[in-house]
Amino acid sequence: MSSRPSVVGPDSGPEAPYPLHMEGKVISGFGRGSKELGIPTANLPVDEALTPWIASIPSGVYFGYASLALPTTHPDIPSASPNGPPKAGTEDALLAAEAPANPPFHIFPMVMSIGYNPFYKNTVRSAEVHVLHKFTADFYDVPMRLLILGFIREEKDYKSLEALIEDINFDCEVAKNSLAREAWAPARGRVIGGKDLEGKLDVQWLLRDA
């Protein structure tokens, strides 16, 4: 059992300097997230010209939300309705006719690492995002936006791969617990894989038109 807190951040919501924003197309990483850790990651390029704040924040583990513009052919794209098409003539049917069947961006909770990962002795700073959803297919080159809401812990070295995996799994639980509060949950839009609650967090940046 970890001695770290299972929730981070005040119940009142994110505090300055958060939220932080980051976006780009998903790139291939070191190839060890799924292979060695069983924790697949979607990487974004670290570009200080686009995200000048990234040079001044500590290396470590962060959490928040990611939005992905999955292509309509992707096997994990959410269905417009889990119960099938709405009955003709109902209010749901009218709303469905007005809204796109597949919105361009879908929101997921995420936990991410920004840093060098001392266990692997990386020489280049990376941004590795673990989307808290089980995907059946990759989504390289897909546009991804990040709304970073808080800091979980500093990065550190580990004596074993097992210790690293244990800490990452606990990071995921901390992220889920921390986001399962009214001020940390979206005010609009559906979060896939998150708690089913109506929150107050503005996530329009994740869903905006490009």
Question: Each PLM stretch: what is its role?
Answer:
Residues 2-210:
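Phosphate/ribose-recognition catalytic cores of enzymes acting on nucleotide-derived substrates
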